[in-house]
């Protein structure tokens, strides 16, 4: 490594190199860098700024949570967008916050109280318990904020929000009252997912399905005499027959047509009879072709019950125990009743058949683990028809654009066929439903600035967490008040989230956002063509993070990755670049340790390249005249401009993977592997030349722009390197590269690009030939080739240095030669390798390499010949193995040929 100095002046670039440590250690700098950014106010948005506004609201993580890989992907992409827009001259608001997470938080606190005090929530008043939750939130709720800082989130911490903040509570009460007064909120007895342990309704997203081993029991209803009316039905939940009110058959099933319209007695209940009804829902080919109907405890039965106006008796209380059946089974748990009811039916001779084991999928509570009970319950609901239509219209009209467009149909599937939304939860932690009941039966909705009359009592339920989350884009900016934030930053520019919460959160934000804008256009702005304003103009949906084999991360598989482990082991930039480099719109992203190590190596490569450039005089102070530059200089500047243009196009369209892959390839394969190596030749070892000074300027110029292009994905290493290179205040406040920062807007020099491509091919082929001949990489050999014939005279010195060949002596005699086809001619390279190769040692090395290649060929062949593996493995994994097989096959051919040449 050489350092160019002027004899009369100290080299400023050498001084800047001294500011860098000897090696890149992210742990040593990341925390201080981040705090410095925050203290400098770089992330604080100013609504009074004259810059154009750009805003993102962070999908609020649960206050109970810790950062997982899905969060890390979300945050990396949002941060990349925010950092780039700041550099492009926008006033950026990236607004952070947390969700109160009703069920999750209440469950955590109840578990804590049970462990520490041996008490349940019922041992406290409601107010006392809620105070306990606030205490817990204060002590434990900041974990995810610390992790956000660790990965570099450039959020405006001064505007951090919590869904139970006073301002957000006011927004919740306001929209509830507006919806209620518009007739869009109502109370009704309908089927819900019920958690007997939590004693509340839960949303679909809080239900996880597991395969359960049970038994399929066939029950005979009606007469035990085969000559008299009877029907056989099958069930895995025998206990629910206590709530059966009907048996359904297909209208065209001749076996049961004579029974349709009749009734059968209930085996245990005198107050119920079983009506035989005909319905297309029934599959006549499945089982007996008859289905037992329990409308209050099964969603399909409930829908059928509505169609046929059936009674809907509930047979379980809120704890999941049998209740109000008037039978000996009252008071039993579901599991106890399942056994006892089957035994009692068997005593009556009504058990026709039992199938054990019978594996079926059963919904379980994500929080408490027990089987969810579909249960008829009095709840509060949002009527969604009009809201869903506005949400669909907004996307169809282009007010909100979904990226990728291929996910639009999934969005329309939700909003075009949406069912009314159950918004009440039987919890204590959350937004209390603002409905009050008078002593004479009056029901009123009380707004945020109103008081309930004396003697009225408030509804005990709280709202579904997703209700307050649906207001997040505008409630966090001060709605229902008129605020500078809403004027400047609403609607938000983009929502970034995973496609799996398209319905649970995204569609509901669209519903409430358009409704709030329709009701208060003076606060949220007017939409287009009379439509309400939308909460975000772009919606970017990314995929899910999976393990390196494409499998979903789960506790049962033990394949989860803690992103903070990667931050500790490889640095935040490695985590971020791995995720950004793999983030294709709407496509799942497989990651593994190899990915993180590769990204860490890339950060180290950037560090070493910058340090080398600085030690060799690189300066960022403009460019010489283009005519004074070498082919290599013009080529790297032109490539930089091409890459900049592509990266801009990709990022404008949320193509994060393509943008970062292109930057990776340019930085590693073109700038480091080729231009830096050529620059070593262009910068003289001693003294100063015009070409050397020009190269130093080009080195600094390219590095300056490259670091700025990489900054959104890799903020920490680029900050350290950019400051050392430029002596600038911070890369955060630098400008995003334009053509003026790359090749000065010049036309691409196609001849220079052609000659560099020829150099790359020439060097690669000679290196490969040397290796095949057994010549050590460090060993110089004499060689003869005509550089003028292939238009590479200017680059002769670089080529000779890169492939370790020297000018031949007068008595030169070739011992080997190769022909290489370049763009303008075929060049013959003659080499004298005599005396440079130990034939015996070379043969031994080649035989060892051949054994390794054959083993790889065998291993990949076995995998690709395994039909079971091919059926299960993701396409990407199979293609990777095919690639390995092809490389191994080529290696076997190459080594075998070389061994034959050695004789």
UniProtKB/Swiss-Prot annotation:
InterPro entries to which the protein is assigned, alphabetical: aa-tRNA-synth_I_CS, aa-tRNA-synth_Ia, Anticodon_Ia_Val, M/V/L/I-tRNA-synth_anticd-bd, Rossmann-like_a/b/a_fold, tRNA-bd_arm, tRNAsynth_Ia_anticodon-bd, Val-tRNA_synth_C_sf
Ranges that cross the membrane: none
GO biological process: valyl-tRNA aminoacylation
Name of protein: Valine--tRNA ligase
Binding site for ATP: 555
Encoding gene per record: valS
Alphabetical UniProt keywords: Aminoacyl-tRNA synthetase, ATP-binding, Coiled coil, Cytoplasm, Ligase, Nucleotide-binding, Protein biosynthesis
One GO MF term: aminoacyl-tRNA deacylase activity
EC nos: 6.1.1.9
Ranges for region Disordered: 1-22
């Amino acid at each position: 490594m050489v350092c160019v100095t002027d004899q009369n002046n100290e080299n400023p670039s050498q001084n800047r190199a001294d500011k860098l440590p000897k090696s890149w250690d992210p742990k040593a700098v990341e925390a201080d860098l981040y705090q410095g950014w925050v203290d400098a106010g770089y992330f604080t948005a100013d609504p009074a700024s004259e810059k154009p506004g750009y805003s993102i609201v962070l999908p609020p993580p649960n206050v109970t949570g810790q950062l997982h890989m899905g969060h890390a992907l979300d945050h990396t992409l949002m941060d990349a967008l925010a950092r780039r827009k700041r550099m492009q001259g926008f006033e950026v608001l990236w607004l952070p916050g947390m969700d109160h997470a009703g069920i999750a938080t209440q469950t955590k606190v109840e578990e804590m109280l049970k462990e520490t005090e041996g008490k349940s929530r019922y041992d406290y008043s409601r107010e006392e318990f809620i105070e306990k939750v606030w205490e817990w939130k204060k002590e434990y709720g900041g974990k995810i904020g610390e992790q956000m800082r660790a990965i570099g989130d450039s959020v405006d911490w001064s505007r951090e929000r919590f869904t139970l903040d006073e301002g957000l509570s006011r927004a919740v009460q306001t929209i509830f009252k507006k919806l209620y007064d518009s007739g869009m909120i109502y109370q009704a007895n309908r089927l819900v997912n019920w958690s007997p342990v939590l004693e509340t309704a839960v949303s679909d997203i809080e239900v996880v399905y597991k395969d359960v081993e049970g038994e399929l029991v066939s029950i005979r209803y009606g007469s035990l005499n085969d000559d008299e009316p009877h029907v056989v039905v099958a069930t895995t939940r025998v206990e629910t027959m206590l709530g059966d009110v009907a048996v359904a058959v297909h209208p065209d099933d001749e076996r049961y047509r004579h029974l349709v319209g009749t009734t059968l007695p209930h085996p245990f209940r005198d107050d119920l009879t079983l009506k035989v009804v005909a319905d297309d829902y029934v599959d006549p080919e499945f089982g007996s072709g008859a289905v037992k109907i329990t409308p209050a405890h099964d969603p399909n039965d409930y829908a059928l019950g509505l169609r046929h106006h059936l009674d809907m008796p509930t047979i379980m209380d809120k704890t999941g125990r049998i209740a109000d059946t008037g039978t000996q089974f009252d008071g039993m748990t579901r599991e106890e009743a399942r056994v006892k009811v089957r035994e009692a039916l068997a005593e009556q001779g009504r058990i026709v058949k039992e199938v054990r084991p019978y594996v079926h999928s059963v919904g379980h509570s994500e929080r408490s683990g027990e089987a969810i009970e579909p249960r008829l319950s009095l709840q509060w609901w949002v009527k969604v028809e009009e809201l869903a239509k506005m949400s669909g219209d907004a996307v169809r009209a282009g007010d909100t654009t979904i990226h990728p467009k291929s996910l639009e149909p999934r969005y329309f599937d939700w909003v075009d066929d949406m069912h009314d939304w159950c918004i009440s939860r039987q919890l204590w932690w959350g937004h209390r439903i603002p409905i009050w009941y008078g002593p004479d039966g009056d029901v009123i909705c009380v707004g945020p600035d109103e008081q309930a009359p004396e003697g009225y009592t408030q509804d005990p339920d709280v709202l579904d967490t997703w209700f307050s989350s649906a207001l997040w884009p505008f409630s966090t900016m001060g709605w229902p008040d008129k605020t500078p934030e809403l004027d400047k930053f609403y609607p938000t520019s983009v929502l970034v989230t995973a496609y799996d919460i398209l319905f649970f959160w995204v569609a509901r934000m669209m519903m409430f956002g358009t409704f709030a804008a329709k009701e208060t256009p003076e606060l949220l702005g007017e939409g287009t063509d009379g439509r309400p304003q939308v909460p975000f103009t772009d919606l970017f949906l990314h995929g899910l993070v999976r393990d390196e084999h494409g499998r979903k991360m789960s506790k049962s598989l033990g394949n989860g990755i803690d992103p903070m482990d990667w931050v500790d082991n490889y640095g935040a930039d490695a985590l971020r670049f791995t995720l950004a480099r793999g983030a294709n719109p709407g496509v799942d992203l497989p990651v593994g340790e190899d990915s993180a190590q590769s990204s860490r190596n890339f950060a180290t490569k950037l560090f070493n390249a910058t340090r080398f450039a600085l030690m060799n005089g690189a300066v960022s102070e403009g460019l010489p005249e283009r005519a004074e530059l070498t082919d290599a200089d013009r080529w790297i500047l032109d490539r930089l401009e091409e890459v900049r243009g592509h990266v801009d196009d990709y990022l404008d369209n949320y193509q994060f993977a393509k943008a970062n892959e292109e930057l990776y390839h340019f930085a590693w394969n073109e700038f480091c592997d080729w231009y830096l190596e050529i620059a070593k030749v262009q910068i003289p070892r001693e003294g100063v030349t015009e070409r050397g000074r020009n190269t130093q300027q080009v080195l600094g110029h390219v590095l300056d722009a490259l670091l700025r292009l990489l900054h959104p994905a890799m903020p920490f290493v680029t900050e350290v390197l950019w400051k050392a290179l430029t002596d600038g205040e911070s890369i955060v406040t630098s400008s995003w590269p334009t053509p003026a920062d790359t090749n000065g807007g010049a036309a691409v020099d196609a001849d220079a690009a052609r000659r560099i491509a020829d150099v790359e091919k020439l060097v690669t082929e000679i290196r490969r030939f040397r290796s095949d001949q057994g010549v050590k990489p460090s060993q110089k050999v004499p060689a003869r080739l005509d550089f003028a014939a292939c238009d590479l005279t200017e680059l002769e010195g670089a080529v000779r240095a890169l492939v370790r060949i020297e000018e031949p002596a007068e008595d030169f005699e070739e011992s080997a030669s190769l022909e290489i086809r370049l763009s303008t001619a075929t060049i013959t390279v003659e080499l004298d390798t005599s005396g440079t190769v130990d034939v015996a040692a070379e043969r031994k090395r080649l035989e060892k390499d051949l054994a390794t290649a054959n083993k790889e060929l065998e291993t990949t062949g076995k995998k690709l010949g395994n039909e079971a593996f091919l059926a299960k493995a993701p396409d990407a994994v199979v293609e990777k193995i095919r690639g390995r097989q092809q490389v191994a096959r080529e290696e076997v051919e190459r080594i075998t040929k070389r061994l034959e040449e050695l004789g």
